[in-house]
């Protein structure tokens, strides 16, 4: 199966639809948005964004913008927030797991602080912490806004920047963290489970 991956579109409906169309055209059978599909400062776009995600069957996880917006809506409404938009935000998981693959906005888990902490801060300390606390073979994440690959080999962790259009092999005997980059910067990717390769994709405006 080919997985189309995107993150951090931040309320841009046009680039979101462009990414969906391009990833589908290149054979992605499952699409996953790794959070921050909305912009907490532009809540008026949220209903349309949710409509695009649902119409195109895109799975999503909660990002820090969705978390912040959910709290803002709840505080302003003063009720249970039972409209479709609020219900969708409340239903978003902090992470999703598919076999040995986890999808999250940043640090997986149920602690909202993990939505705000970047895995990529220019070094490997955060990735080392994450590898030590988790067991998944692959983690696909966003939030850091730059396509980066962390590999764990023989207890050594390497950080590699992923260039646009680059294809990287992810061996079954290694663990890896893949930051897909920000869709608002034209970055997305496809993971091919059959060949164990991840390819960075450029989404033009």
Kindly label every feature range from the protein language model.
Residues 52-55, 132-134, 171:
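Short, conserved loop/helix-junction motifs that constitute active-site signature segments
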Residues 157-205:
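Binuclear metal-dependent phosphoesterase catalytic core
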């Amino acid at each position: 199966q080919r997985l189309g991956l995107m993150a951090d579109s931040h309320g841009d409906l046009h680039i979101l639809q462009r990414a969906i169309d391009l990833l589908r055209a290149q054979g992605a059978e499952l699409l996953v948005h790794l959070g921050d599909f909305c912009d907490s400062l532009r809540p008026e776009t949220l209903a349309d964004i949710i409509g695009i995600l649902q119409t195109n069957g895109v799975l999503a996880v909660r990002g820090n913008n969705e978390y912040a917006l959910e709290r803002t809506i709840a505080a302003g409404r003063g009720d249970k927030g039972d409209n479709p938009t609020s219900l969708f935000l409340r239903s978003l998981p902090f992470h999703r797991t598919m076999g040995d693959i986890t999808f999250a906005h940043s640090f997986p888990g149920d602690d909202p602080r993990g939505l705000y902490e970047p895995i990529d801060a220019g070094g490997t300390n955060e990735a080392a912490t994450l590898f030590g606390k988790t067991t998944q073979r692959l983690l696909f994440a966003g939030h850091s806004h730059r396509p980066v690959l962390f590999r764990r080999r023989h207890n050594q962790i390497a950080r590699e920047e992923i260039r646009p259009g680059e294809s990287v092999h992810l061996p079954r005997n290694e663990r890896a963290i893949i930051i897909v980059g920000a869709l608002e910067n034209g970055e997305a990717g496809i993971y091919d489970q059959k060949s164990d390769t991840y390819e960075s994709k450029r989404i033009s405006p």
